[in-house]
């Protein structure tokens, strides 16, 4: 089912969707003429923003975004737990004294959990404020140029509140149990007691590193995917091309009037300053299709399930191939001699030539379908992308618009400068021929391609932003842990330095410990990234989900940032004064 016009309406007060749909159905019935096989009508739907293909892409994007946000939430929770665990270690003596004075373990745990939840609620308030502030900017990342309600509503606030409470409570549970279960005598006498806190802390740091590597690797993959989509050889030139669409039939032009209008329009556009070439075409890449099928001639290779040959069509003017930058492999383009009533000629692409006449020269051959008398092939054009990125090689036949008039016209203008700057001038030039001329849409070919690749750009930007945030959280957690351990081990470091340990050896031990955690996390993250390949493969374009360069680059980035984050605590450890450290202890 196809459509040529979409109308968006707002219901009047007191009018239900069912009432409006019934009225529109009556109007639809009045527009149908079954006696002549006319099936035009009105389709009423609430799904008014996006086409089905766009809805599917946005659904995939939404699922990916939910997964990415969930990973960031887990990293943030682990980071929060690490900080609380370090804080709980420093409060062990306080909790032990309170326990000695009669405070029950359950009461201590409740207090610590309450503190965790309050911190989580404070973070929730900051996050909600940022969400309101950045909602407009986030909406601009959506593809297809539609504005969707992005401002948080009460449902979003409720979910954020619940997640904050639950996450902060879960993250604070282990630190609370650790602090409330400290050895009373040892803590009061300042003796260091062996606990499992360090193991839990290390596990949390490793998990952050692993999850952040998954996101960083994903960011690299999506960035490469977007680059591949934007730099793919489409078989035509998109830069410096301006497109103006006009539907002459909907504006009351007869075929004779339309034929008379086009030459003058092309002349006016050619004479504009900054215009290099001008042509017309019925179809523009990525903007719908016009097709037919035919019975395969002897020796042909059918390309459809019903045994026929499916052919994409386009009616173009002379200079179309030069204007769009489509290379002619052999033969010629259309010229002024290809007139109405003359020998019907066509240019086929390489794929169609191979299907119709495998291994033979297509020039001079004839293509016939329906009631047409046949088209003589005068040229072969290079294959191009017509309908979707990554499509299988598609058949295409070009006919001369002078011989096969089409009222739907796309003026293709090659410009010397920025094409968008020429748009108002070109529209004004055409309105000198018809003051009431309406344009279906006006866009640069670069904009058309950008819309097609928007899903890959959005994926790259979002995963890149969240990957960077995840890496920042993980590295901050590692920095906090290393700094905490250096501070806790000040006496040990001082004693070792007093016994002759060099500063380089001390710094090396600190760096080895932190990089060991980072390397373990990176290894686990690589395993996770490989395991998730079947979920990410469908979202990538011409990039393998296990691309080794992406995984190596993500791992190197993680280790480099981890080393940088550990450098300051390691340097601080080398500046410990042995005498002062022992005296303070």
Over which residues does each language-model region extend?
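Hydrophobic alpha-helical transmembrane segments of multi-pass inner-membrane transport and secretion
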Residues: 58-93, 170, 198-223, 456-491, ...
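Small-residue-rich transmembrane alpha-helices
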Residues: 43, 81, 116-184, 224, ...
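Alpha-helical transmembrane segments of integral membrane proteins
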Residues: 47-55, 83-110, 114, 134-253, ...
């Amino acid at each position: 089912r196809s459509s040529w016009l979409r109308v968006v309406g707002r219901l009047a007060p007191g009018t239900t969707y069912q009432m409006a749909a019934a009225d529109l159905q009556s109007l639809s019935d009045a527009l149908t003429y079954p006696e002549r096989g006319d099936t035009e009508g009105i389709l009423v739907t609430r799904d008014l923003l996006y086409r089905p293909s766009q809805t599917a892409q946005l659904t995939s994007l939404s699922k990916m975004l939910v997964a990415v946000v969930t990973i960031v939430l887990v990293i943030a929770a682990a980071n929060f737990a690490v900080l609380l665990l370090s804080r709980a270690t420093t409060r062990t003596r306080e909790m032990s004294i309170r326990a000695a004075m009669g405070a029950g373990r359950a009461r201590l745990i409740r207090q610590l959990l309450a503190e965790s939840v309050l911190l989580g609620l404070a973070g929730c308030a900051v996050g909600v404020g940022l969400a309101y502030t950045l909602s407009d900017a986030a909406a601009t990342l959506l593809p297809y140029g539609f504005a969707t309600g992005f401002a948080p509503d009460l449902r979003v606030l409720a979910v954020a509140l619940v997640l904050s409470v639950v996450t902060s409570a879960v993250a604070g549970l282990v630190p609370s149990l650790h602090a409330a279960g400290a050895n009373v005598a040892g803590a009061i006498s300042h003796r260091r007691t062996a606990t499992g806190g360090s193991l839990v802390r290390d596990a949390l740091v490793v998990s952050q590193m692993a999850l952040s590597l998954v996101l960083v690797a994903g960011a690299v993959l999506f960035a490469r995917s977007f680059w591949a989509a934007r730099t793919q050889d489409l078989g035509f030139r998109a830069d410096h091309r301006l497109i103006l669409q006009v539907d002459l039939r909907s504006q009351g032009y007869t075929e004779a009037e339309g034929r008379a209008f086009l030459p003058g329009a092309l002349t006016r556009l050619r004479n504009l300053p900054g215009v290099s070439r001008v042509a017309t075409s019925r179809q523009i890449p990525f903007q719908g299709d016009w097709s037919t099928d035919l019975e395969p001639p002897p020796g042909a290779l059918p390309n459809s399930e019903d045994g026929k040959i499916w052919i994409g069509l386009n009616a173009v003017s002379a200079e179309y191939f030069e204007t769009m930058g489509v290379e002619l492999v052999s033969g010629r383009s259309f010229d002024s001699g290809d007139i109405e009533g003359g020998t019907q000629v066509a240019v086929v692409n390489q794929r169609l030539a191979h299907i119709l006449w495998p291994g033979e020269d297509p020039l001079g051959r004839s293509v016939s379908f329906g009631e047409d008398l046949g088209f003589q092939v005068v040229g072969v054009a290079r294959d191009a992308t017509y309908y979707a990125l990554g499509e299988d090689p598609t058949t295409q036949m070009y006919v001369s618009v002078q011989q096969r008039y089409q009222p739907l016209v796309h003026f293709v203008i090659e410009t010397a400068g920025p094409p968008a700057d020429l748009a108002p001038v070109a529209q004004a030039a055409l309105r000198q021929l018809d003051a009431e001329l309406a344009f279906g849409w006006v866009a640069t070919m670069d904009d058309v391609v950008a819309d097609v690749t928007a899903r890959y750009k959005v994926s790259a930007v979002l995963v890149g932003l969240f990957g960077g945030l995840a890496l920042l959280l993980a590295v901050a957690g590692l920095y906090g842990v290393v700094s905490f351990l250096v501070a806790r081990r000040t006496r040990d470091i001082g004693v070792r330095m007093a016994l002759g340990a060099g500063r380089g050896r001390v710094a090396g031990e600190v760096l080895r410990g932190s990089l060991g955690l980072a390397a373990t996390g990176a290894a686990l993250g690589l395993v996770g990234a490989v395991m998730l390949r079947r979920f990410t493969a469908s979202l990538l374009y011409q990039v393998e989900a296990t691309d080794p360069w992406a995984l190596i680059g993500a791992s190197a980035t993680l280790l480099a940032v981890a080393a940088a984050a550990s450098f300051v605590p390691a340097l601080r450890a080398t500046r410990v004064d042995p005498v002062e450290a022992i005296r303070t202890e």
